[in-house]
Amino acid sequence: MFTKKINFKLQSSLELLITLSFGLALLLPIVIIAFIQVSNSNTSLTAIESQQAASKLSSVATLVGSEGSPARQLVQINVPPGVENIYVGNTMVSGVGHEIIFQIVSVINSSYITTYTPVNVSGDLGGIATQGTYLVNVSAQSQCQGNPNVQCVYMQPVV
């Protein structure tokens, strides 16, 4: 009789262990999917905030560029987390171009948020790639620093 009681206890413990294993096997993929969804939503939020900041810089650059030199304006932008670098103009050739690029790096991938301006833009905003709120001086110049033969709008952070 004593052995039957032990076998019954072992059997119920084994059944409980199997039931818990099935529960964990079902719960683990749900937890992993939830973490992936949270990561995707954070990346999407960073992309949207970067798009807003780039559009703000682009519209101010267009306004200042249409007024011509010596027009200037201070603009406040919010740099979201995950921004690796901010490129203004064409950094490969002469530093003067028509685009503002936010490079976003996340756990999943790296992406670029780009806005175009009808005026030539140049500048150095790579130093403000960390999360925070910054003031950027946007000024129209008759001779651009990257290429003195071209008029452009120059962007630099206010220190």
Q: Over which residues does each language-model region extend?
A:
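N-terminal leader/signal peptides at the extreme start of proteins
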Residues: 1-9
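Histidine kinase transmitter module recognition
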Residues: 9-10, 67
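N-terminal export/assembly leader peptides and their processing motifs that target proteins to secretory
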Residues: 32-159
